[in-house]
Amino acid sequence: MTPKRHPAGPRRLVPRMARGSAPWLLPAFTAAGLAVLTSRGSRTRKALAVPVVALAAGMAWFFRDPDRGPASGRFLSAADGVVQSVDPLPDGRTRIAVFMNPLNVHVNRAPIAGVVTGVEHRPGGFLPAFDKDSERNERVIWTFDTEVGEVTVIQIAGAMVRRIVPYHPVGAKVEQGERIGLIRFGSRVDVYLPPGIAPAVEVGQKVRAGETRLDRD
């Protein structure tokens, strides 16, 4: 279930780029600028400049960070993408896994307001995020102290990822829907609903970070 969207304020003339994207964007834009400047008067150079400019444009699209309007619900999606699984766990929690493909926004958001009590980075592999062995991938494990108890969110690296970029330290207060971090390229985010909270999404459903409600009343 996706709550009604509210206006997120005036449109930006220049799209926001995600924090942590500069190491990728600066070289891409620099190369594109040089390719354009050196292509004048040469058809061959112009032809060579096209893929360089296209790559820079693709990078800008990938690292876009659009504003999202406020939405209602105890739990909102932490990621854009498609629900990969909804798994009840032995401890009573429910794990909702959202797979992000390279075309999705890769900035992740807090599913609920709270205080960050843990930000643990675990190194690992870089298997496809939909692979069953991706449980051994690099990840960042977030824990939040919230009004409904402890909530866990896990950012999981995918096949093309080489870094997860957290935005907040332990002790930080975050609002629901606030940006918490970036995963570069295709990846997955898991949200763990506490015991007694039923999921409102199903496998295959498209979700948007900070807008799609994950729980039922």
UniProtKB/Swiss-Prot annotation:
Top-level EC class, please?
A: lyase
| Catalysis: reaction(s) | a 1,2-diacyl-sn-glycero-3-phospho-L-serine + H(+) = a 1,2-diacyl-sn-glycero-3-phosphoethanolamine + CO2
Whether Lyase counts among this entry's keywords is yes
**At which residues is there a site annotated Cleavage (non-hydrolytic)?**
G186, S187
Post-translation changes: Is synthesized initially as an inactive proenzyme. Formation of the active enzyme involves a self-maturation process in which the active site pyruvoyl group is generated from an internal serine residue via an autocatalytic post-translational modification. Two non-identical subunits are generated from the proenzyme in this reaction, and the pyruvate is formed at the N-terminus of the alpha chain, which is derived from the carboxyl end of the proenzyme.
User: Which membrane topology describes this protein?
Assistant: Peripheral membrane protein
Q: How is the cofactor bound?
A: Binds 1 pyruvoyl group covalently per subunit.
Which of the residues bear the PTM Pyruvic acid (Ser)?
Answer: S187
Lineage top rank: taxon:
Bacteria
Q: Which family does it belong to?
A: Belongs to the phosphatidylserine decarboxylase family. PSD-A subfamily.
Its subunit composition reads: Heterodimer of a large membrane-associated beta subunit and a small pyruvoyl-containing alpha subunit.
Q: Enumerate the PANTHER family for this protein.
A: ARCHAETIDYLSERINE DECARBOXYLASE PROENZYME-RELATED
Annotated function = Catalyzes the formation of phosphatidylethanolamine (PtdEtn) from phosphatidylserine (PtdSer).
The protein depicted here goes by the name Phosphatidylserine decarboxylase proenzyme
Which species is this UniProt entry from?
A: Thermobifida fusca (strain YX)
Upper lineage: Bacteria, Bacillati, Actinomycetota, Actinomycetes, Streptosporangiales
